[in-house]
């Protein structure tokens, strides 16, 4: 990361990446998968949670809780991973007045930045395509991670109707390709082999 007015060129930082991202495997199973969280920079379980029809496509629904329980309450919030070596953006000390919290206005208070998220993925089990996604995330500062004090951002996002339609069409196209590669081509190659 660079500060304002930094004359040094930007540098790339490698990010270790474990778990799934952007899609699930072909022939997705009804089980738990590790799914990479880009904010926490590590994988968290995406648990199979049932089947659901999305625009005429039978999908598997998976839920992922990052630092929250099934109801969305903080149970183990993630300390926000810093982009700086000294964790300058992870903990901040300033006055109670600046934080906007009760107490002596000039009292210096140190708070840590935390993050929680709850996601739901609707996945085509044949192609592994995520056809719909919902995410609720909360970024906040607190002295105790289980007691948010200053909200940085709290949002809920869901795939748009247009995105869902596009992803369902992509999943259907991918299903056709999977069928071609797993059924038609092996039979064709076997027939060619027998003729030769």
Show the residue positions of the predicted features.
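Membrane-proximal extracellular "stem/stalk" segments
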Residues: 85-86, 93-186
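Membrane-proximal low-complexity regions enriched in glycine and acidic/polar residues
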Residues: 23-132
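Solvent-exposed, non-transmembrane amphipathic alpha-helical segments
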Residues: 56, 143, 148, 188-191, ...
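Extracellular or lumenal secretory-pathway regions
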Residues: 1-30, 137-138, 157-196
């Amino acid at each position: 990361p660079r500060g304002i007015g930094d004359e040094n060129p930007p540098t790339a930082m490698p990010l270790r990446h474990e778990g799934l991202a952007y899609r699930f495997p072909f022939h997705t199973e009804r089980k738990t998968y590790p799914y990479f969280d880009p904010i926490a920079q590590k994988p968290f379980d995406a648990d199979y949670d049932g089947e659901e029809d999305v625009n005429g496509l039978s999908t598997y629904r998976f839920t992922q809780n990052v630092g929250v329980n099934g109801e969305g309450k903080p149970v183990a919030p993630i300390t926000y991973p810093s982009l700086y070596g000294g964790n300058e953006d992870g903990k901040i000390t300033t006055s109670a007045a600046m934080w906007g919290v009760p107490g002596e206005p000039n009292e210096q208070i140190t708070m840590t930045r935390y993050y929680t998220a709850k996601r739901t993925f609707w996945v085509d089990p044949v192609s592994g395509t995520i056809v719909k996604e919902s995410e609720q995330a909360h970024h906040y500062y607190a002295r105790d991670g289980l007691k948010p004090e200053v909200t940085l951002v709290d949002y809920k996002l869901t795939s748009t109707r247009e995105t869902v339609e596009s992803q369902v069409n992509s999943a259907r196209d991918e299903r056709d390709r999977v069928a071609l590669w797993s059924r038609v081509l092996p039979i064709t190659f076997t027939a060619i082999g027998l003729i030769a």
